[in-house]
């Protein structure tokens, strides 16, 4: 989810909580969930980028090895 969607969802829950007092107990856990979701997403993005970079390095090394094995004409 994009941050815009998370913020929209957060405000929607706040409006509902204003109308119904039962949702007040959910607000702290909602805020904690949003914060952990944003932090978790950043960690996943960074680890994905690192994995993609490693895969790219492996492919480049394999390609160079393959090109070295080809006969010169």
From Swiss-Prot:
It is found in: Secreted. Coiled coil: none annotated. The keyword ATP-binding does not apply. Keywords: Antibiotic, Antimicrobial, Cleavage on pair of basic residues, Secreted, Signal. It comes from the Eukaryota. GO terms for biological process: defense response to bacterium. Transmembrane segments: none annotated. Its main location: secreted. Residues 45-73 form a propeptide. Residues 1-22 form the signal peptide. GO terms for cellular component: extracellular region. Expressed by the venom gland. The primary structure of the mature peptide is identical to that of TtAP-3 from Tityus trinitatis (AC P0DRB7) and ToAP4 from Tityus obscurus (AC A0A1E1WVR9). Belongs to the non-disulfide-bridged peptide (NDBP) superfamily. Short antimicrobial peptide (group 4) family. Antibacterial peptide. This is Antimicrobial peptide 6. It comes from Tityus costatus (Brazilian scorpion).
């Amino acid at each position: 989810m994009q941050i815009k969607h998370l913020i929209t969802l957060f405000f929607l829950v706040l409006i509902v909580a204003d109308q119904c007092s039962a949702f007040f107990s959910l607000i702290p856990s909602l805020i904690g969930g949003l914060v952990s979701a944003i932090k978790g997403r950043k960690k996943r993005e960074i680890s994905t980028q690192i994995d993609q970079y490693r895969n790219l390095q492996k492919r480049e090394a394999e390609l160079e090895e393959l090109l070295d094995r080809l006969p010169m004409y």
